[in-house]
Amino acid sequence: MTKPRIVAIDDEVEFIDVLENYFGLRGYGINVAVRGAKGIEIVKEKMPDVVLMDLKMPGIDGDEVLKLFKSMTPSPKVIFITAYDDGGKTKARLLKMGAYACLDKPVSSLKELEETVNKAASN
């Protein structure tokens, strides 16, 4: 089975390093960005299967980026990973808008994240 292609966008460099190492060592094609605008460029260029993205980053609106990614053909599956908590309202809205999943940060299990990525890519 071919591993999904991933783009990870997060302004926390340490978290990006963890994702890049974890998925890279397991044979996934992964590109990373610590700035939202650069991440959008990479997604447009690489056309990944899955985008892992923080919701709250300087100069970037998760809702708008999700709309942009959903308008692409083929459209990548977007998995938000965020520490932002407003009682689940934002997560519910993003899921309704077409996000594949909204996960809590810190990520409790990279293995579970990997399973979510694989499920997203196979849908």
Describe each model-derived feature in a short phrase.
Residues 41, 63-74:
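Short amphipathic alpha-helix used as the core "switch/output" element in two-component signaling
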Residues 81-82:
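Hydrophobic/aromatic residues positioned on beta-strands within the core alpha/beta folds
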Residues 13-31:
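Two-component/phosphorelay signaling modules centered on CheY-like receiver
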Residues 32-41, 62:
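Helix N-cap/capping motif at the beta->alpha junctions
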Residues 46-52:
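Active-site beta3 strand of CheY-like receiver
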Residues 8, 53-54:
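Active-site T/S-Asp motif of two-component receiver
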Residues 57:
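Receiver (REC) domain active-site loop signature in two-component systems and cognate sites
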Residues 64, 85-107, 111-115:
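Alpha4 helix (beta4-alpha4-beta5 surface) of REC/receiver domains from two-component response regulators
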